[in-house]
Amino acid sequence: MYDKTWEACGLALLRAQNLRLSFSDRLLFENISFDVENRDKIGFIGANGVGKTTIFKILSGQLQPAQGDVFVAKDIQIGYMEQHAGVEKDRTVYSELLSVFSHFEKMEQELELLAAQIEKNGKDIDTLVARQLSLQEQYENNGGLTYKSRTRAALLGLGFTEADMHRPALTLSGGQLSKLNLAKLLLSGANLLLLDEPTNHLDIASVEWLESFIKDFKGAAVIISHDRYFLDAVTNKTMELSHGHLTAYSGNYTQFIKKKEKINEDLKRRYENEIKEIKRIEGIVEQQRRWGQSHNFITAASKQKQADRLKKALVKPEDDAQAIHFSLTPRRESGNDVLQCRDLSISFDGKPLFEGVNLHLTKGQRVFLLGANGCGKTTLFKILMGKHHAQGEIRFGANVDVGYFDQVQADLNLEKSALDEVWDAFPNMSQTQVRTALGTFLFKGDDVFKPVKL
């Protein structure tokens, strides 16, 4: 059940109780309960596929759990990225973001109308003036004098240039659209933000701006992120979803790691001691049975019950989290000279993006390409892949085969399963080989049959 009529209990803005959900007879999670309190900044962590985004959908009312309740306090507005996806056809980047303040624009229009009516000295002037003063006060108290400057500040903070602000929003790349949707969410007026990987597509300066925004944000935020440094900078609580259950900790990510290590060490020590005790008791049971007297069998039965109770109460320490393990092995050996670029230049709409780029890569080198958003890093990759034409010379060495990982992954068929998507790319592989390859990237069991979009 999703209920927005709940009276807040203490400082809680949202309460989740006993959430449970399954997909295709597979239990995703159960007994999930937690509170989000005023000014909480919560890091929500867990391995991919455990259900973090699914819980966000439940909290925002987009998905109903099989069991459990979500209570939201009165006057709490939840902001979730998917609610702000998509842009209007004819809007610029600036006007698209400004649209979240449409209520201020309506106030401005009414204030102009009231001013015109008052100027005519019509009847009911006292009523008109009273309405004007009330509306003006409401406009100013709610931020009407600063919303345009806040719009510009958010765009600049997230890496948009002055020129970008005047571009049609529909011409933005996938990464830029994600940033624009993030800006819309941040400025939406929501007082409880659900942020799912908010640092994706952000450069260092933009991440720093986002950190500052969240620290100053007077509402609460729950943040899914794999960026531990970002979580350390902005969070004061941590929730971990693991093996279908949720555990809450006070403190940021680093503090969570230390606490969890201590808990696991204590649990491992207790587990080992209990295993020793069970073996000791079972040794007594075996000995009593060998002695074979009636009173020995009574003692053996009593001790066996004691051992069974200990076994039932055993809590096994959590295994170390699985990590992705793979090696990059070229299908053939290249020459020593892998890539040479000379005087690469490219312009868009008559404006140079970059020029005079020279590059020489040799076999065995690992190169990190660093630069602000919009400076042309992805464009350079697309030039190398032949997707953009540029001035200058590009020469690949002997036996060089290029692999390209696109940040948007536009070539993926979201309706296919992970298994079929990889198998279609490598039809000569057996299903076992494909599933083994997927397993190295932690696609286990039925996960390989899920549509890519999930």
Tell me the role of every PLM-derived stretch.
Residues 1-271, 322, 326-454:
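ABC ATP-binding cassette signature C-motif
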Residues 121, 286-298:
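Short intracellular "coupling" helices and adjacent cytoplasmic loop segments at the cytosolic face
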Residues 163, 276, 315-319:
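Short, flexible active-site-proximal loops enriched in glycine and acidic residues
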Residues 219, 283, 290, 312-315, ...:
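Generic structural signal for secondary-structure transition and capping sites
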Residues 260-284, 296, 300-314:
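Intracellular alpha-helical coupling/juxtamembrane segments of multi-pass membrane proteins
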Residues 296, 318-320, 452:
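Basic terminal extensions of ribosome/translation-associated proteins
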Residues 307, 314-321, 325:
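Intrinsically disordered, low-complexity regions
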